[in-house]
């Protein structure tokens, strides 16, 4: 196993930082300039807007003013402490919180009433006639598109390179089940490290830099292989997602996590205990694949 040198690692990071900064600036400008940015029904639009927070927002982990809640209320991230609405053009400036955050180590130390007021401001700081004030994204917009992900698993697998780091998969992903999935989605089971690469694809990870950098297109989490190598850690395909990522939280109409739902559908068997009534798995997958295979 070859480890990247410090120079190679720094070069990759510098390039990615420049690309991210440029791409997020372009995305922000594009969203602000668009004539039709109000699409509270669109999951694709929500994920695109969420991307503006990836390397900027200072309060990612706070449930009340974190990136998910801000994005649900129609705000784009302009900088570490500033939100902007692309419809009414109003802004929310939280620069004053930086000092409070520094003194308390965490926003969790803020008085609950203060946090509640901040959360309310996500709605009230829009202008009175702003569409985002009248109707925000529905809370369940941030979940997996099941039909799309059933197809994307195979595409992610085909694009993955040979792994360069030890990988930890869920224990339910046995070789027998993974081979079953490989046959179902018609990918090369003889490919080197096929079982592990399929497990990576089944949990939502794609490659941004071949063999070096993985990315999730839902929570926009990026993981550098060199970080794991230098610390002697495994790539835990579930733990590395953000805690709010649809791949690792219960999905609508079921208490199964995102990856569990996709895995069960592809295996065509009941693997995980579910307390809610779910659809007929075999009927759903047969119909979905007969429809989607024709689009390949």
From Swiss-Prot:
Organism phylogeny: Eukaryota, Fungi, Dikarya, Ascomycota, Taphrinomycotina
Claim: DNA-binding is one of the keywords in the record: no
Cellular component, GO annotation: cytosol; nuclear pore nuclear basket; nucleus
Protein name: mRNA export factor rsm1
Recorded GO MF terms: RNA binding; structural constituent of nuclear pore; zinc ion binding
Purpose of the protein: Involved in the export of mRNA from the nucleus to the cytoplasm.
Organism domain of life: Eukaryota
Stored Pfam families: NuBaID_C (PF08600), zf-C3HC (PF07967)
GO BP terms, alphabetized: mRNA transport; nuclear mRNA surveillance of spliceosomal pre-mRNA splicing
Zinc fingers, C3HC-type class: 40-174
Cellular localization per UniProt: Cytoplasm; Nucleus
Keywords, in A-Z order: Cytoplasm, Metal-binding, mRNA transport, Nucleus, RNA-binding, Transport, Zinc, Zinc-finger
InterPro entries found in the cross-reference section: NuBaID_C, NuBaID_N
